[in-house]
């Protein structure tokens, strides 16, 4: 299965008639493995800051998580595994696997819990596969 299929079928899936706004699978180095059409153009330093927060949990809290120029307020996550952010009625979930970052961006009517479930389910599966 291609990485694009994981994005299209597993991240951009339909839940009660709603779906993520955008999603991507990127390498720890910031290289894009696959992304949805609406995924924001991000900078390498934004990915570096996310990776740093996985190594040093809490490092993004003072500045927020930035992706594609959008700032998300960092909310509860799982140190070293998941970072969650909020912006207005939407937000972002980033799950770290051994080789990749699984990123989901949502807006209402999708809920934070639904976004977390979508992103973390794929991330957990990839971890089980050694990725």
UniProtKB/Swiss-Prot annotation:
Q: Which domain of life is it from?
A: Eukaryota
Q: Which Pfam family name is an example for this entry? A: Profilin
Q: Name one GO cellular component term.
A: cell cortex
Q: Which sequence ranges form a coiled-coil region, renumbered to this chain?
A: none
Q: Which Gene3D superfamilies match?
A: Dynein light chain 2a, cytoplasmic (3.30.450.30)
Q: Which key words tag this protein in UniProt?
A: Actin-binding, Allergen, Cytoplasm, Cytoskeleton
Report the GO molecular function annotations.
actin monomer binding
| Annotated compartments | Cytoplasm, Cytoskeleton
InterPro entries for the chain: PFN, PFN_euk, PFN_sf, Profilin_CS
User: Keyword NADP, does the record have it?
Assistant: no
Keyword Cytoplasm annotated: yes
- Where exactly are the transmembrane stretches of this chain? none
Mostly located where? cytoplasm
Protein family according to the UniProt entry:
Belongs to the profilin family.
Q: What does this protein do?
A: Binds to actin and affects the structure of the cytoskeleton. At high concentrations, profilin prevents the polymerization of actin, whereas it enhances it at low concentrations. By binding to PIP2, it inhibits the formation of IP3 and DG.
Query: How does the record describe its quaternary structure?
Result: Occurs in many kinds of cells as a complex with monomeric actin in a 1:1 ratio.
Provide the protein name: Profilin-5
Q: Which organism is it from?
A: Hevea brasiliensis
Source organism lineage?
Answer: Eukaryota, Viridiplantae, Streptophyta, Embryophyta, Tracheophyta
């Amino acid at each position: 299965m291609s990485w694009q299929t994981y994005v299209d079928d597993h991240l951009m899936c339909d839940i009660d008639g709603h779906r993520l706004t955008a999603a991507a699978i990127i390498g720890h180095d910031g290289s894009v493995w696959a992304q949805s059409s609406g995924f924001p153009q991000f900078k390498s330093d934004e990915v570096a800051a996310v990776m740093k927060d996985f190594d040093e949990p809490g490092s993004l809290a003072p500045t927020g998580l930035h992706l594609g120029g959008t700032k998300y307020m960092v909310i509860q996550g799982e140190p070293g595994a998941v970072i969650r952010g909020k912006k207005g009625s939407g937000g972002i979930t980033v799950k770290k696997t051994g080789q990749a970052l699984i990123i989901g961006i949502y807006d209402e009517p999708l809920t934070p819990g639904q976004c977390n479930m979508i992103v973390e389910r794929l991330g957990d599966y990839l971890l089980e596969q050694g990725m």
